[in-house]
Design a protein with these regions (language model features):
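Histidine-acidic metal/acid-base catalytic patches
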Residues: 71-75, 79-80, 96-201
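Hydrophobic faces of well-ordered beta-strands that scaffold small-molecule active sites
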Residues: 1, 22-28, 43-49, 84-86, ...
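Alpha-helix N-cap/loop-to-helix initiation residues
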Residues: 3-6, 31, 59, 92, ...
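N-terminal pre-domain/capping segments
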Residues: 1-44, 68, 108-114, 139-140, ...
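Active-site acidic/histidine proton-transfer and metal-coordination neighborhood
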Residues: 31-117, 123-126
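Surface-exposed, active-site-proximal loop segments in enzymatic domains
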Residues: 9, 13-16, 37-38, 51-64, ...
Length: 201
């Protein structure tokens, strides 16, 4: 994630990653300066973004409209050589059934095999009880799973691993399913230094 004040630091961030042997794995949303730098340094990070929740008379029409809205970014990420991760962030667009439907639509109708799903536990508190079923549905399309401590009702929403009631079982479910893709830890706490937050996980 980033804010306007971080834009001037984009290039230095890339240089520091290179200096310390770190992969620039993913970038949130779209920014022209970032995309220019990706081309300059020949980087191909995953691009994570949400699709809209359009109003339509049928589920099929909503899926098609959501997919159509993503087409400029679908084409741009393909040219960049980057995977595009549809990001669950609540609402209709954050439901696994809809993430899969939009992903399938883009792959089948627009040859967008680089499009997949980024599933965030911290936006999935409503999926705790049926996580195994939903993981199976999403698994063929997953680009990354981001972990989080998980309590009922998102109390609190952001929680270090090992401090919640449900994340151990959810991680066991991920292992049992044979998921072998990237696993992420996000630092979403403004009150804690990033190094401290990541080490806690």
């Amino acid at each position: 994630d980033w804010r306007a004040q971080h834009v001037k630091e984009f290039e230095e961030e890339i240089l520091q990653y290179k200096k310390h042997g770190l992969e620039f794995f993913a970038f949130w949303s779209v920014h022209e300066e970032a995309f220019r730098l990706f081309e300059k340094y020949k980087l191909h990070p995953q691009i994570w973004n949400m699709f809209p929740s359009p109003k339509a008379d049928t589920q099929e029409a909503r899926v098609a409209a959501a997919a159509k809205a993503m087409l400029p970014l679908v084409d741009r990420t393909k040219k960049l050589g980057s995977k595009l991760g549809l990001y669950n962030h609540g609402g209709w667009a954050g439901e696994p059934d809809n993430l899969v439907a939009v992903c399938k639509y883009l792959r089948e109708h627009h040859q967008a095999k680089h499009v997949g799903i980024v599933y965030n536990l911290h936006h999935g508190h409503g999926h705790i009880t049926d996580f195994e079923k939903l993981l199976k549905l999403m698994q063929p399309y997953l680009h990354c799973i981001n972990l989080n401590g998980m309590n009922e009702g998102a109390q609190p929403k952001i929680l270090s691993l090992g401090k919640g009631q449900h994340e151990a079982a959810m991680i066991a479910t991920i292992r049992k399913a044979g998921y072998a893709g990237p696993i992420g830890i996000l630092d979403l706490r403004n009150d804690t230094d990033t190094e401290v937050a990541l080490r806690e996980n």
